[in-house]
Amino acid sequence: MTALKTTETIPLYTIRGLPIHGFRNMGTFVDYLFAGERVETGTLVAINAEKVLTAEKEVALRTLLDRAEYKYADGISIVRSIRRKYPQADVTRIAGADLWEALMERAGKQETPVFLVGGKPDVLAQTEAKLRAQWDVNIVGSQDGYFTPEQRDALFERIRASGAQIVTVAMGSPRQEILMRDCRHHYPDALYMGIGGTYDVFTGHVKRAPLVWQNLGLEWLYRLLSQPSRIFRQLRLLKYVAYHYSGRL
């Protein structure tokens, strides 16, 4: 079963010209990806307001996003915009960090081979150890984020030779999207997921917002209070707020 065949049944919502797949909840998403004899192939990309704005300015990123089979609403602002534009939409926010953990748990149960890319060497090692201890994940290979452009082809060959069915890349956007795109040219038979700083959160090196903040859609505010230097990034999002309330979605 291929990603292109199955995505035909997933509701699609367009925000600023970018198609986004909508799911009722994360469990439905995970079940969908694992519905066949093996996990689906393709690329998972989290969409938030900042990424929408960046894609409008950077053609290369927009092209990468357009080619990704699964674009899901990670940011609460995207969910609210979908509901505003499509009042009948049954869609919820799916945080990338939570989705990754759910995929790893399911991969452990189904013995799905996983390859991890990105992060600092010590954080990556801790991530591997915790995944094996917590969910018995079959990790068939890993590579920290400190490799040169000249080493990329060798990494792609390692991923192909490992037989991994899930490849998660923690390098930040758009580096991780570029790496996944290029790796898929060498090895298309896997599900690729860009996960930013998720390894740091998973291993406790970075503290995530408390659940009550997450449920209120205020995780962005918690991060801002924890890291005041993010204020300039947040100010950029005023443009998206204008899009939302003016109906230019």
Swiss-Prot record:
Pathway: Bacterial outer membrane biogenesis; enterobacterial common antigen biosynthesis
Pfam family, one: Glyco_tran_WecG
CDD domains: Glyco_transf_WecG_TagA
InterPro entries assigned to the protein according to its UniProt record, in alphabetical order: UDP-ManNAcA_Trfase_WecG, WecG_TagA_CpsF
Alphabetical UniProt keywords: Glycosyltransferase, Transferase
Keyword Transferase carried by entry: yes
A biological-process GO annotation: enterobacterial common antigen biosynthetic process
Assigned EC number: 2.4.1.180
GO molecular function: lipopolysaccharide N-acetylmannosaminouronosyltransferase activity
Catalysed reaction equations from the record: UDP-N-acetyl-alpha-D-mannosaminouronate + N-acetyl-alpha-D-glucosaminyl-di-trans,octa-cis-undecaprenyl diphosphate = beta-D-ManNAcA-(1->4)-alpha-D-GlcNAc-di-trans,octa-cis-undecaprenyl diphosphate + UDP + H(+)
Highest taxon in the source lineage: Bacteria
Family: Belongs to the glycosyltransferase 26 family.
Entry-linked PANTHER family: PTHR34136, UDP-N-ACETYL-D-MANNOSAMINURONIC ACID TRANSFERASE
Function of the molecule: Catalyzes the synthesis of Und-PP-GlcNAc-ManNAcA (Lipid II), the second lipid-linked intermediate involved in enterobacterial common antigen (ECA) synthesis.
Protein name: UDP-N-acetyl-D-mannosaminuronic acid transferase
Organism: Pectobacterium atrosepticum (strain SCRI 1043 / ATCC BAA-672) (Erwinia carotovora subsp. atroseptica)
Gene designation: wecG
